[in-house]
A protein has these predicted regions:
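Metallo-beta-lactamase
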Residues: 67, 74, 83-94, 108-180, 186-259
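Active-site metal-binding loops of divalent metal-dependent hydrolases
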Residues: 8-10, 57-60, 91, 136-137, ...
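Short acidic capping loops at alpha-helix termini that bridge into adjacent secondary structure
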Residues: 80-83, 127-129
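Core dinuclear metal-dependent hydrolase active-site scaffold
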Residues: 2-8, 42-47, 53, 168-196
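Zn-dependent metallo-beta-lactamase
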Residues: 1-50, 234
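Residue-level marker for buried hydrophobic side chains located in beta-strands
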Residues: 53-55, 87, 131, 200-202, ...
């Protein structure tokens, strides 16, 4: 399988839950608010024998009318229209921002479009992909609302024929396993992709950074920090025994471990 990290840059985040861009060459973490965390925001593209997958969708930033996630894919030689599956660990704003985009003025509103016509309408950002979302995670997003979720970016998911709502654990097309973990948020899920003798693991925000896998770290920002820590330890041990390839969404230095791709 081919793994392509789609980095959107490094950021600091504090109790305000605002993502502030951070230049690792110039900026000083000590100059940021007390308690600020340094994180990467890094969706992934995985090319398998069956699919072109996108795992989580970043912050949804645009430059010159082009979604950053789309530009990163284009830079890697992949057309956004070629993506066949979008796997969502959860719907927090730093993971789900690129699910949809503002529809260009004057365009035709398709089945995945919400909000009428014109510049205010939104459409799913991958027109030919199936989106895989835990049903209860979407419901929870609307219950919880800001500041962790931006529900207007999620409205497209509600009635689109492109969306497959998942209820609990299961397997997609015989080779993508998914499991609800909770821990970071109540309906967070993780994925194992098994193809061609390889096993890739994407742990979303329960397993966001390499260093957290190696320590008994309990995060205050997690819904159940103790469970998250225990899951990381379990996955780290099993992953080494079974030669998993780990994808780390928030790791500034090590997006893929081991880095053999």
């Amino acid at each position: 399988m081919k793994i392509i990290p789609l980095s959107e840059g490094a950021f600091t985040i504090d109790k305000t839950k605002l993502f502030v861009p951070f230049d690792t060459e110039k900026d000083d973490l000590q100059q940021r608010a007390v308690g600020s965390l340094l994180v990467e925001v890094q969706p992934f593209c995985v090319v398998t024998s069956e699919d072109i997958l996108v795992l989580d969708t970043g912050l949804g930033f645009e430059k010159d009318g082009v979604l950053q996630l789309h530009q990163n894919l284009l830079d890697a030689g992949i057309e956004p229209a070629a993506v066949t599956k979008v796997l969502m660990s959860h719907l927090h704003k730093d993971h789900a921002g690129g699910i949809s985009r503002v529809k260009a003025a004057g365009g035709d509103a398709g089945a995945g479009t919400i909000g009428g016509t014109g510049a205010s309408a939104r459409e799913l950002s991958f027109p030919n992909a199936r989106y895989y979302v835990q049903r209860k995670e979407l419901e929870y997003a609307y219950e919880k609302g800001p500041s962790s979720y931006i529900t207007e970016e999620l409205d497209c998911l509600k009635d689109s024929p492109q969306v497959v709502f998942l209820d609990g654990d299961g397997v997609l097309d015989g080779y993508i396993k998914y499991a609800v973990t909770g821990a970071h948020c109540p309906y967070h899920q993780v994925f194992w992709i098994v193809d061609g003798g390889e096993k890739i693991f994407f742990g979303g925000d329960v397993a966001p950074q390499l260093q957290q896998m190696k320590s008994r770290f309990v995060a205050k920002y997690d819904y159940d920090g103790k469970k998250a820590m225990e899951l990381r330890q379990e996955w780290w041990q099993k992953g080494q025994e079974e030669a998993w390839t780990f994808l780390f969404y928030h790791d500034v230095k090590t997006p893929v471990w081991p880095d053999s791709h």
